[in-house]
């Protein structure tokens, strides 16, 4: 699967997924980028009913704890499609910045400390210990909730145009706007489904 690349107009999933999309009553996209990446391969979906509903992230779980912050953090950026090459380049360019990578990864620069796993209940505190959250994927990401979590936790986000969360205008309007967007996402999802099935 190569979203938004010419070779994906005929890639193997397209033949399986096209009828599923076409038969659906409603498509729920996690961001405008999520929708655009699929319309690239399935332009006929332009006319299909859809709703934009971001991933549910609880602002009660992610907030600024006013801790001392230092360096950068990334989650799963050691995975190729999540942007390992770009992440490593960023770390090399910022060799004096200590970087914490949560998740898999190998052959990392010396300024990167890797942690295999952080409990969900400890993620907010982990974000709060860092100034910057780095996420530079190579494929369009439907949303990437870690971006929203880190942003709500007070991190400055270093992203790129392939991060679905950042395609929401609220991310350029400030944390309060993002908080309002996300705290209603679970309800919006169920409201959209109820409208379709009723």
Spell out what each predicted region is:
Residues 2-27, 128:
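Membrane-proximal helix-turn-helix segments that form the acceptor-binding/catalytic region
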Residues 23-26, 69, 111, 130, ...:
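Short, well-ordered alpha-helix to beta-strand connector turns
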Residues 137-146, 161-162, 166-168:
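Nucleotide-sugar-dependent
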Residues 128-142, 155:
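Acidic donor-binding loop of glycosyltransferase active sites
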């Amino acid at each position: 699967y190569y979203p938004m690349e010419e070779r994906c107009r005929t890639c193997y999933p397209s033949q399986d997924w096209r009828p599923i999309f076409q038969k659906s009553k409603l498509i729920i996209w996690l961001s405008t980028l999520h929708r655009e990446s699929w319309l690239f391969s399935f332009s006929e979906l332009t006319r299909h009913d859809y709703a934009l509903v971001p991933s549910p992230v609880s602002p009660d779980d992610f907030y600024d704890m006013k801790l001392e912050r230092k360096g950068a953090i990334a989650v799963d950026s050691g995975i190729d499609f999540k942007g390992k090459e770009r992440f490593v380049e960023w770390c090399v360019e910022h060799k004096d910045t200590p970087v914490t990578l949560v998740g898999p990864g190998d052959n990392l620069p010396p300024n990167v400390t890797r942690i295999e796993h952080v409990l969900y209940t400890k993620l907010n505190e982990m974000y709060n210990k860092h100034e910057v959250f780095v996420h530079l994927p190579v494929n369009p990401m439907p949303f990437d909730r870690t971006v929203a979590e880190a942003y709500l936790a007070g991190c400055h986000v270093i992203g790129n145009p392939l991060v679905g969360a950042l395609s929401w205008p609220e991310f350029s309007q400030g944390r309060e706007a993002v908080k309002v967007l996300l705290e209603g996402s679970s309800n919006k999802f169920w409201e959209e489904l109820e409208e379709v099935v009723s």
